[in-house]
Amino acid sequence: MGLSLSLLLSAWKEVVTTQFFSFKNPVESFLETRSFSLKLKEGGLTSRTNSFKSENPQEKSPKTGMERSLSFNSWEIVTEVETEPMNKEDEEIVEPTKPARNSLNGRNCERIQITKPTITPPTPFVFFSPRPVTELDAAATTLQKVYKSYRTRRNLADCAVVVEELWWKTLDAAALNLSSVAFFEEEKHETAVSKWARARTRAAKVGKGLSKDEKAQKLALQHWLEAIDPRHRYGHNLHFYYDVWSASMSAQPFFYWLDIGDGKDVNLEHHPRSVLQKQCIKYLGPLEREAYEVIVEDGKLMNKQSMTLINSTEDSKSIFVLSTTRTLYVGQKKKGRFQHSSFLSGGATTAAGRLVAREGILEAIWPYSGHYLPTEDNFNEFISFLEENNVDMTNVKRCSVNEEYSSFNSSGYEEEATKEEEAEKKPAETIVTEEQEEEKERERPVFQLAKRLSCKWNSGVGPRIGCVRDYPMELQSQAFEQVSLSPRISPGSTRFPSPYGPIPSPRPSPRVRVSPRLAYMGIPSPRVQVNC
């Protein structure tokens, strides 16, 4: 009985070991699989078991290896059968080239060394310039100064806007005091504010009603905003955003509000911000304007620098400006880029308009400028300048409607001329009738062409803020504090001090847009001495 049971167990053990990869026993097969060697065989990798030496070397069983190609696509089982027993000395053991042995629970294992790839950081880009370092540092400093100067110019432009608004607020209070009976009952000297009020009344009479004409006021506002803007954006576009700012009652100055303040995201449908930023008027400096200077030689208009005769083209309009020093400038108008104000950087002129010339021979002139609004006196001043320089005015057309000259007949051109002429004539007649009795009692103003407003701007860059000096000192100080340009503001205070509140806007009357001082800024008309 015992013999039969032993035979059964031996047979079962043999079956199990044979099915389990033909190893003698599972424990030995497990240990043998932990130790293996790789050797190159016919372009492939052959994995063979490196068996441990058992006590009975005569008992050998077939060994199994796994042959795999380098691509690992197909694996093949290779069975090696030993026909003869091998002695311990004759047994060949395949080992790696440099095995590293490590003791782990009494077993010898091969150590596989894995080399980690070295990650090399990218080489930093070194800016190379042929210019010396000192020159590069100077360029960086210049760039910082340019940005800082632009920021300062914007603050100064805002100062001009603020002092103009504050002036209207003070002027309304002065006008209210002047209209009261108590003002005349008290014996006191007339203040500077009251003189400003009387100056406004006088300016409205001698200026053909400019302060009461809405059309002229709008054009004057456009001229002013364009002149003081550091970028000289087209005044026609600026004044639409100026109206939005006035209605918003914002406590921020206009240009700060427009560029980086609460209004930086305002985009009007009919006047988009992209057009506002694109259309910037070029203001010429003293050297730049020399290229547009025109002289008269033998009765013909000739460019002084290039000595070429003036020729008007059909697809553009030739514009001219006569400076206060009686220097003539002629150029081609480009809407939103180059216009009458470009020649003298927005400064005052004697005459302005358009002309047509062929080979230097003057054929037509027209006193039209939506920027300067020239009057008949300005036109006569220009004609006298031409006659003094021996220009034959016999065949020169002096009207705006003429079929022979396409420059005067383009669509919208005659329409603008008609509107401007009506805007100039209508208020003039009205004011003469209203103030007729008062004019009889006062002395008639005397025109003096030699004395003009202080609007001589030579530089083509920067805002035109000289008009701020003409305001009372108290308003100047308050305006500087409003835009944080006053040294009296503490460093810890905010940019816009709250005690002053919003800038007084909109103005008292929708028809009054700018003060008389700014209304006449740059307009080429004879000035009068206002005796306050």
UniProtKB/Swiss-Prot annotation:
Main localization, broad class: cytoplasm
InterPro entries: IQM
Record field: compositional bias (Pro residues): 499-509
Subcellular location as annotated: Cytoplasm; Nucleus
Region (Disordered) residue spans: 47-67, 85-104, 410-443, 487-513
Residue ranges, compositional bias (Acidic residues): 85-94
Protein origin, superkingdom: Eukaryota
Biased composition (Basic and acidic residues): 56-66
Polar residues compositional bias, start-end: 487-496
Induction text: By hydrogen peroxide. Induced by light. Down-regulated by salt stress and treatment with mannitol.
Tissue expression summary: Expressed in roots, cauline leaves and flowers, and at lower levels in rosette leaves, stems and siliques.
Occurrences of domain IQ (ranges): 136-165
GO annotation, biological process: cellular response to hypoxia; response to abscisic acid; response to salt stress
PANTHER family found in the cross-reference section: IQ DOMAIN-CONTAINING PROTEIN IQM3, IQ DOMAIN-CONTAINING PROTEIN IQM4
Purpose: May be involved in biotic and abiotic stress responses.
Protein name, entry field: IQ domain-containing protein IQM4
Organism: Arabidopsis thaliana
